[in-house]
């Protein structure tokens, strides 16, 4: 992500009027604060439910994909508890920082951690979806590509990277000696840091995800043309043909389920970039054009785009759970809703699943 080098986007709204806010701008700030409070409430409630559902459901907890979703929910939860409340605080006190400089650095560091960790979690989920479609029999092998242990290791690497990268300004790569100046808490980062962060934490993951979904599209096209079944037949010749042939018969059904899961992940990815792309583009424009561009844009625009970015943390939980039966069943149990005692076929189908099948529960 990209950030302004001398102040956060939302505090730029206050710099347009030295003698106080106009009536219309003051009203906009109040409305923005109300919307942000609503986003915080929904983001905390929704992501806590997602985390509780994954921890409380053995099938969800055993899925590598769901571990990535859990990590993404933690990112959104941290944003809603450690970053957004300070934005509300700033609006309520006319963008004057009334806390310590240490708390200012803690706020900006928390922001620098949560947003990149979200996009990197989305990247590893997309890579996992691509790999599951590229090698549909991976779940049946003795060692599938993405195991639970590997997923935990990847998640740890994502968080370590995000934390270390966010701490670089605190450790010395600063724009100026102090983060609090003129009673404002500023993002004390250099232009070079912002540009590097843009490439590593936004542009590169975006291009990588585009690559993965392009490959997924090509796999789907090959399936429709019948090319993929030939490759499966060849694989069945080379390793345990008798065993694989029985499982290959179920390949198309599993492929459809994995493809549906990939589409649902794509919706989550699209929502993230829809919410954060405008904020990032505006930040880059302000970095390369200088502060003179502030006189050419509406004063409400920076805070409005930041609000749109924060909205993503509240949108994700419904996107995770809308098409997932395990989530719905877990929520029903949590809230005391009982399922109708019918559907014997579904029950028998579930018991027919092997333990390896159950580890492949995805967003469907």
Predicted features along the sequence, with ranges:
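Intrinsically disordered regulatory tails of 7TM GPCRs
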Residues: 1-20, 141, 224-262, 267, ...
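Seventh transmembrane helix
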Residues: 204, 208-209, 274, 280-283, ...
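Extracellular TM2-ECL1-early TM3 structural module of rhodopsin-like
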Residues: 25-33, 61-125, 132-143
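Extracellular N-terminal segment of 7TM GPCRs
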Residues: 1-45
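Class A (rhodopsin-like) GPCR signature focused on the TM5-ICL3 interface and adjacent 7TM helical core
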Residues: 43, 121-135, 169-173, 198-234, ...
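Loop architecture of class A 7-transmembrane GPCRs
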Residues: 12-22, 91-110, 135, 143-154, ...
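Helix-to-loop junction signature of class
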Residues: 36-39, 53, 78-94, 108, ...
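Cytoplasm-facing ends of alpha-helical transmembrane segments in multi-pass membrane proteins
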Residues: 44-55, 80-85, 113-137, 156, ...
